[in-house]
């Protein structure tokens, strides 16, 4: 399996990080893709990548919730990192209107800048869009026309938005929320099909049932794969095979 979105550098994993990673490897997780969130997470991301170089791979980007008054200074630091070394993707970036709408203009500008970087460095982009799919797509569509490729991680949206993403060949990241009864993700998955799905946990957040409300662990991605298989009436193994292929198409490797 390829875990396309997990914050392995989180302090919540500090007591047993190596054990949790090994547990996931033991059940078949081959790669873990780690999104950066701001300038302060860069060093922790690199530390985990250095400790597990065959399995853990860094993204680079500025998360929309960290787009504040100093966002231009943060973007300058992040751009320096992109110039200095290779990354698996630009991420995680996007628009988040759940907590605070006052920085929407700055979030839009930050997303535009980072979409340009994705094209410049020929990297996929990993989108965080919370209560902001219309706003995110408005910014992204011109770049999609120019060949920008990416994934909407932890996707929650409408069938119309699914259609837009499928039209541009974008991937859709599905995690533990698929196990929540009232989330309605099962209907979306039936519409998406396996051809554009990738697996994620978004750990340590959004643990699947029966661990909802607790720390999300990387091995729980197996639960996500099984649930998707149940929804689509295919085996877990078929889900893993196809989502691995989708991940390689997007991220390479």
Spell out what each predicted region is.
Residues 1-253:
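Mid-domain alpha/beta scaffold segments of enzyme catalytic cores
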